[in-house]
């Protein structure tokens, strides 16, 4: 897929993750102990052979820039193509992702790539985009989006887009999951199209003034564009709320999910941080947990995901929790969470 430019658009709704994203974009939110949310989509692109990747982010981007560095952990630190980051502020009510794309239109013109893949960051999966572009070309679509047929969406993937498909997997309608159906075709917000068409969409959005997001333009023109849908059958999580964030971390404790995401043919890369291995004292008791390096465990930990440099004191019992990095939990502290509740513990 060296003939494709990858766009990661961070214009995501963070209203339901405010407590976790007040000082950072959702893309740089720690997940699975040592990773960040953006690692999954970024690794998917590089594993698929995409060498030119642009990340379009809003404000609060310090932690994201610190994490991305020069792109070397993902092998996109290059003289040609490589990683580019474009920032804009969401304080201007008329400045949205379409205007951000317009301000940087030369990036797309000069790329000389035939195809453009535009994605959000909050869809967690392990996906080979080579199969997507192959399907896109075979079907002769103008735009191809990725979806997953998900069961029990009355409790999961709330507020995600739902696709209505015909017998040829063509998109004929787009709605929103409000939790009223048992199953639905969840739109993963990954769109592949010709770069020329993508540029035309940007100008059309500006001229018409009706659409402020590329995905809304696509949804509003499914009668004019041939929009196909490619089915993804692997594990998928959408980090669009604190509840979804917690549930995804708990899913990583499942052996099948963990192997699919982190130990498949395509690995997930992240920025390395040097620290000593986690130390477990004779008073510690740990089971079915993911614990990043640099931590010191004296208490009992069960079914937890724990970030880097966390201290858990003697006599403390932590169960079914997500503990973010640099958290200090003193002695004789007890936090037992039922499976239908959520909690995130972090330092101030």
Specify the residue positions occupied by each region the protein language model found.
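Left-handed beta-helix
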Residues: 1-7, 196, 204-348
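Unchanged
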Residues: 1-250
């Amino acid at each position: 897929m060296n003939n494709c430019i990858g766009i990661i658009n961070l214009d995501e709704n963070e209203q339901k993750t405010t407590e976790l994203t007040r000082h950072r974009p959702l893309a740089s939110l720690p997940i699975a102990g040592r990773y960040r949310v953006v690692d999954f989509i970024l690794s998917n692109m590089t594993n698929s052979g995409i060498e030119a990747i642009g990340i379009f982010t809003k404000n609060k981007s310090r932690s994201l820039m610190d994490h991305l560095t020069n792109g070397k952990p993902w092998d996109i630190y290059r003289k040609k193509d490589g990683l580019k980051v474009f920032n804009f502020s969401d304080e201007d009510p008329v400045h949205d992702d379409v205007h951000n794309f317009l301000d940087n239109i030369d990036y797309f013109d000069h790329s000389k790539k035939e195809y453009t893949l535009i994605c959000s960051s909050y869809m967690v999966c392990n996906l080979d985009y080579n199969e997507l572009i192959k399907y896109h070309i075979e079907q002769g679509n103008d735009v191809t989006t990725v979806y997953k047929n998900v069961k029990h969406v009355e409790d999961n993937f709330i507020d995600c887009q739902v696709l209505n498909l015909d017998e040829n997997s063509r998109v004929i309608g787009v709605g929103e999951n409000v939790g009223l159906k048992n199953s639905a075709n969840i739109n993963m917000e990954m769109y592949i199209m010709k770069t020329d068409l993508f540029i035309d969409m940007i100008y059309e959005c500006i001229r018409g003034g009706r659409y402020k997001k590329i995905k809304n333009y696509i949804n509003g023109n499914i009668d004019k564009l041939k929009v196909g849908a490619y089915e993804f059958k692997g594990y998928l999580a959408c980090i669009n709320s604190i509840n979804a964030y917690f549930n995804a971390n708990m899913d990583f404790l499942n052996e099948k999910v963990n192997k699919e995401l982190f130990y498949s043919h395509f690995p997930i890369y992240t920025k390395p941080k040097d620290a000593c291995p986690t130390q477990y004292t004779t008073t510690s008791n740990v089971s079915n947990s993911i614990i990043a390096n640099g931590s010191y465990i004296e208490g009992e930990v069960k079914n937890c995901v724990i970030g880097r440099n966390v201290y858990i004191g003697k006599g403390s019992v932590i169960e079914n929790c997500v503990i973010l990095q640099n958290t200090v939990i003193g002695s004789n502290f007890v936090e037992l969470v039922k499976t239908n509740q959520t909690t995130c513990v972090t330092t101030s």
